Amino acid sequence: MKEFIIKANKAVTNGEINLKDLPGSSGRLDLLCRCVNSAFFLSHDMRRDTIFYSVNYGDPNPPVTLKFVGSELKRVSPDERSIALFIKKALEKDATELWKESTSGIYSSKREFRDIILEKKNEGKRIFYLHLNGKPLEDFEFKDDEDFLFVLGDHIGIGDEDEEFLEEIGAEKISLSPLELHADHCIILVHNILDRLK
């Protein structure tokens, strides 16, 4: 199982989303939509072995975590507007500590960024923090029977405190490129690496 989590520092936390202004008034929701596209959509299929989390810390009610489960997703199209509509529906529900399903395979809760990561660590997943200054990809060995969580930052990053937290729990800091990449591009590169193990 491949799982991805992004800390979305400015992404809105209610359903008041302007579909005509995803990058601006919605707190870079366009970035999240592209990440969902990259996490799940193939040319004529969907990735069923993937889960994607977005932990939104924007106004008015942070945090709200969205969870997308590839094996359960239905009716979502790959374009940003379609994905944004499904995100809007999820954010219209009052989030609590428990996961609430808004549409097939899409859930919301009030879980924190660190809580999700600790939960995955306790499940035995290898935790990778994707960072420009990490160890080169070539220095790591991946096995097909392992479960992974890949931690991503948005255009702002995850912040010093969360970086220290990842270091404390033993997350492996990995660099996919000598150049700074968009989060959605990182997801595609990770998929490509793991696809080749099969």
Curated annotation (Swiss-Prot):
Record field: catalytic activity: pseudouridine(54) in tRNA + S-adenosyl-L-methionine = N(1)-methylpseudouridine(54) in tRNA + S-adenosyl-L-homocysteine + H(+)
Chain positions recorded as S-adenosyl-L-methionine binding sites: 130, 153, 176-181, 186
Subcellular location: Cytoplasm
A Pfam entry, by short name: Methyltrn_RNA_2
GO CC field: cytoplasm
An example molecular function term from Gene Ontology annotations: tRNA methyltransferase activity
The keyword Methyltransferase is annotated on this UniProt entry: yes
Family: Belongs to the methyltransferase superfamily. TrmY family.
Quaternary structure and partners: Homodimer.
Function of the molecule: Specifically catalyzes the N1-methylation of pseudouridine at position 54 (Psi54) in tRNAs.
NCBIfam families for this protein: PRK02135.1
Protein name according to UniProt: tRNA (pseudouridine(54)-N(1))-methyltransferase
Source organism: Methanococcus maripaludis (strain C7 / ATCC BAA-1331)
Gene assigned in the entry: trmY
